[in-house]
Amino acid sequence: MPATTASPRETAERFLSAAIGADPGDMADCYAPSVVIEMPFAVAPLIPARVETTREELRERFRAGTATRRYKSLGEVVIHETADPGVVIIEYELRGEFTQTAESFSLRFLMVLTIRDGQIVHSRDYSNPIAGAQVIGRLPELIAALSKDVTAINS
């Protein structure tokens, strides 16, 4: 019997489960070998607004994050199917804790995922850049980057 390809909804559900799994690198298995990730609210140069990357680079990035934080559970999750059968929109909350202090945190996301053959080929990730920078320990860098932007605008 031939293997069936996961639907976009099933792929999104697998991604969310992997986010709180024992090995966050497993999230990378939800992505195609080459993928485009866009983060429209990202603040360059801290985080690029668009990245063309590979599944293995994502795996390394996801695993590296466990040095400072672990995602423990999901809050509210809503998966929206769209008129395009290859696109789903997921809204979710990731709850976790910092590895050194066990202090809790929560991050909310909205992602527009384009999925082909059961793998994410394109992602548009919308999240709060301030909360994200705080969780990854880069809030001072974000403030500096924003200050430079404001200075350039006011010049």
Positions of PLM-derived features:
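Short, low-complexity N-terminal intrinsically disordered segments enriched in polar/charged residues
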Residues: 1-29, 33, 141-155
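Short N-terminal micro-motifs specific to bacterial/archaeal maturation
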Residues: 2, 18, 49-50, 123
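A beta-strand edge to alpha-helix "cap/lid" segment located at domain peripheries
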Residues: 2-4, 67-155
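A solvent-exposed, acidic/Ser-Thr-rich amphipathic alpha-helical stretch
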Residues: 5, 25, 32-85
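Hydrophobic alpha-helical core bundles mediating ligand binding, dimerization, or RNAP-core interactions
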Residues: 12, 16-19, 31, 39, ...
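Hydrophobic pocket/interface hotspot
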Residues: 15, 27-28, 35, 54, ...
